[in-house]
UniProtKB/Swiss-Prot annotation:
Reaction(s) catalysed by this chain's protein: tRNA(Met) + L-methionine + ATP = L-methionyl-tRNA(Met) + AMP + diphosphate
Cofactor stoichiometry and binding remark: Binds 1 zinc ion per subunit.
Record GO cellular component, one term: cytosol
Functional summary from the UniProt entry: Is required not only for elongation of protein synthesis but also for the initiation of all mRNA translation through initiator tRNA(fMet) aminoacylation.
Region: Disordered, residue numbers: 557-577
PANTHER family found in the cross-reference section: METHIONINE--TRNA LIGASE (PTHR45765), METHIONINE--TRNA LIGASE, CYTOPLASMIC (PTHR45765:SF1)
Entry keyword set: Aminoacyl-tRNA synthetase, ATP-binding, Cytoplasm, Ligase, Metal-binding, Nucleotide-binding, Protein biosynthesis, RNA-binding, tRNA-binding, Zinc
Translocase recorded as keyword: no
Gene designation: metG
InterPro entries, per database record: aa-tRNA-synth_I_CS (IPR001412), Anticodon_Met (IPR041872), Met-tRNA-synth_bsu_C (IPR004495), Met-tRNA_ligase_1 (IPR023458), Met-tRNA_synth (IPR014758), Methionyl/Leucyl_tRNA_Synth (IPR015413), MetRS_core (IPR033911), MetRS_Zn (IPR029038)
Motif ('HIGH' region): 12-22
Molecular function terms, GO-annotated: ATP binding; metal ion binding; methionine-tRNA ligase activity; tRNA binding
UniProt organism field: Methylibium petroleiphilum (strain ATCC BAA-1232 / LMG 22953 / PM1)
Record-annotated tRNA-binding domain positions: 591-697
Native organism taxonomy: Bacteria, Pseudomonadati, Pseudomonadota, Betaproteobacteria, Burkholderiales
The protein, known as: Methionine--tRNA ligase
Length: 697
């Protein structure tokens, strides 16, 4: 029975261009959407720009534009990326559209009627010059623990201390430099801690989608959610109520009946999924409310692991208690790395999607490579340049494309491009084997196990190439009286090539369209693998795909950033300050030997709930136990990035009681004093062969 699907990807924040992580997610979702359409299902695939919030308002002001114009300019640059990588959204909208304003306010009113909205007074820093309340990211000052300057309003990146913004010494607004003052403000909260919400979410997160029968969430996601639900013996932890309001001036959607109050961007952003679909339906003359109320509709979201909390807790609770359908599935993926490392422009490991296209690299090389690394689990995808070249050249060109190129020419020259339906038993056995794989490959696409689907397709291609090598059409073409046999062998190859193209079409849509033209067939669906072409005429073969020139990879990776005048060798000779700050006063060797620096291996790492700066690290320092250290490196490293790495720790620093637990040391990292001009945070890592516990002397 045909399905009707509503599919989205996470909304990109409208303050910059797409990065490679966006493109990876769009490719993952686009493959799934194309597969569903090849199965005969109706799919509405929509996206939008996340257009609200203080960062956009401030960036627009600096650019001399209104927020609306700033967002519109960003949106105007989306098309080259989407078209270039064959991402087939049905609609692209903005969370600042009228549909989102209406839907967000309607959702709020429904939650308020349901008794899940309350208000309370909170204290915040206020910039008297800008006349606005300051989020933590716009407040800096001296750390109350170690005295380090220019630290953010919630934690110190030097000593790792966590504190309230009110504890900062000499605080200042990063917007104006003014000293902020404390002001109270009434804020609106969504009562996520309500027993009603908790009971619903426990059922929803553990449940299965009514139509597919599959779990709504992946096992890894469900395990993480269980951690968020957990409370200690004193009842601490668990889900907290959610502050959904911000004070004017703010670029966003006004809260009904609350002058000067706006929805926090994370309330209206996911509602943007619905708004984009409504915008599309209105343009198509379709009934949005009827579609969303239809029990046959399936709602599916593709997101990155960093926004799991919002999409698996806030979002379904908001929908359920405002009377709307909840998602059938939230599919979570990992991040993308380069050669096992987090991408970094300064280290020459950043991939610009637009540069990829501009230097002439085939978009479907990347689609294939990413698909060959993706599965249904929450795992990172690693882009390795050498592996990229080998997979594309060996699999796509060497195994798949070559099947057609080895057979089509003989059919055109000797048989006027006509295939024969009279195939011997050997050919029928080969083709029946390819046809029998259809359901398995379809199941793998459905489960987002793209890597397995492509491995199975390439294993089939290997069997076809073995058939070609065994029957040697190039030799048959030279032998008298072998025309019928030559036509059979070449027809078998083209039939097999067509079946493989069906299986690869969700990943390679542009190439598949070329193949459909070459084969003179209508757009192919998965069901078409159940039949053969038979006595059918094809067009003359034209080369379908070039091999990757490894030199293109050198051009792809952005070179390290050019040194600024302040840090260039010439400037250094003129007395530049190294690292942006003067050297500390001279100490004696006796002073230095008081510090016990040891090599440590990071055996585990996790985010610290309630902090945007800290990671909780578990360190092996060679003591026979693991130490816990809170380190302010979250801005540069995800937990998965650092697990297994060696680094340097101050081992004899007195344990420090912090809000989140006891920190037993300090991990050393390097950064420039002027982080705006010179962003980056770098762990100190020893050369290979090091073991935990070695002393740094």
């Amino acid at each position: 029975m045909p399905r009707q699907l509503f599919v989205t990807t996470a909304l990109p924040y409208a303050n910059g261009h797409f990065h490679i992580g966006h493109i990876m997610e769009y490719i993952q979702a686009d493959i799934w959407v194309r597969f569903q359409r090849m199965q005969g299902h109706a799919v509405h695939f929509v996206g939008a720009d996340d257009a609200h919030g203080a960062p956009i308002m401030i960036a627009a002001e600096k650019a001399g534009k209104t927020p609306q114009q700033f967002v519109a300019d960003i949106a105007a640059g989306r098309k080259p990326y989407l078209d270039g990588f064959h991402i087939a959204f049905d609609n692209w909208h903005s969370t600042d559209g009228p549909e989102n304003h209406q839907l967000a306010q309607d959702t709020y009113r429904a939650l308020r009627r349901n008794g899940l909205i309350f208000t309370r007074e909170i204290e915040q820093f206020f910039d008297p010059v800008k006349a606005m309340f300051l989020p933590d990211r716009y407040i800096k000052g001296e750390c109350p623990k170690c005295g380090a300057k220019d630290q953010y309003g919630d934690s110190c990146e030097v000593c790792g201390a966590v504190y309230a913004p009110t504890e900062l010494k000499n605080p200042y607004s990063t917007l104006t430099g003014a000293t902020p003052v404390m002001k109270t403000s009434e804020h609106h909260f969504f009562q996520l801690s309500s027993p009603r919400c908790l009971d619903f979410l426990k059922d929803w997160t553990h449940g299965s989608a009514p139509i597919s029968g599959q779990p709504r969430l992946q096992a890894e996601v469900l395990n993480k959610i269980k951690e968020w639900f957990a409370t200690d013996e004193q009842g601490h932890g668990g889900l907290a109520d959610w502050d959904i309001s911000r004070d004017a001036p703010y670029f966003g959607i006004e809260i009904p009946d609350a002058p000067g109050k706006y929805f926090y961007v994370w309330l209206d952003a996911p509602i943007g999924y619905l708004a984009s679909l409504k915008n599309y339906f209105d343009k198509q003359g379709l009934d949005f409310e009827a579609f969303m109320a239809d029990p046959k509709t399936e709602q599916v979201h593709f997101i990155g692991k960093d926004i799991t909390y919002f999409h698996t807790l806030f979002w379904p609770a908001m929908l359920h208690f405002s009377g709307r359908r909840t998602p059938d599935h939230v599919f979570v993926h990992g991040f993308i790395t380069v050669s096992g490392e987090k991408m970094s422009k300064s280290r020459g490991t950043g991939i610009s999607p637009l540069r990829y296209l501009e230097i002439g690299m085939n978009a479907e090389w990347l689609r294939y490579y990413i698909a060959a690394k993706l599965n249904g689990r929450v795992e990172d995808v690693d882009f390795n340049p050498d592996d990229f070249v080998a997979r594309v050249n060996s699999d796509l060109v060497g195994k798949y494309i070559n099947i057609a190129s080895r057979a089509a020419g003989f059919l055109s020259k000797r048989f006027d491009g006509r295939l024969t339906a009279e195939l011997p038993a050997e050919s029928r056995t080969l083709l029946e084997g390819l046809q029998a794989a259809r359901d398995d490959i379809a199941r793998l696409y459905e489960d987002r196990e793209y890597a397995k689907a492509l491995r199975e397709a390439m294993a089939l291609a290997d069997r076809v190439n073995e058939y070609v090598d065994a029957n040697k059409p190039w030799e048959l073409a030279k032998q008298a009286g072998q025309d019928a046999r030559l036509q059979q062998v070449c027809s078998t190859c083209i039939e097999a090539f067509r079946l493989l193209t069906i299986y690869l079409k969700p990943v390679l849509p542009a190439l598949a369209a070329q193949v459909e033209g070459f084969l003179k067939v209508e757009p192919m669906r998965f069901a078409d693998a159940g039949r053969l072409l038979g006595a059918h005429a094809i067009s003359e073969y034209k080369h379908l795909m070039q091999r990757v020139d490894p030199k293109l990879l050198d051009a792809l990776f952005e070179p390290p950033a050019e040194p600024s005048p302040q840090t260039s060798p010439a400037a250094a000779g003129a007395g530049a300050v190294p690292g942006g700050e003067a050297l500390a006063p001279t100490i004696t060797i006796d002073d230095f030997t008081k510090i016990d620096l040891r090599l440590a291996q990071i055996v585990d790492a996790a985010l610290v709930e309630g902090s945007t700066k800290l990671l909780r690290l578990s360190l092996d320092v060679g003591e026979g136990r693991h130490r816990t250290v809170f380190s302010g490196i979250q801005s540069a490293f995800k937990p998965a990035d650092v697990i297994g790495k060696f680094t340097v720790v101050v081992a004899n620093l007195a344990p420090r009681k912090m809000k989140f637990g006891l920190s037993e040391g300090m991990v050393l990292a390097a950064s420039h004093a002027d982080e705006k001009t010179h962003p980056g945070l770098y762990l100190l890592e020893p050369t290979p062969g090091a073991v935990p516990g070695l002393r740094v002397r």
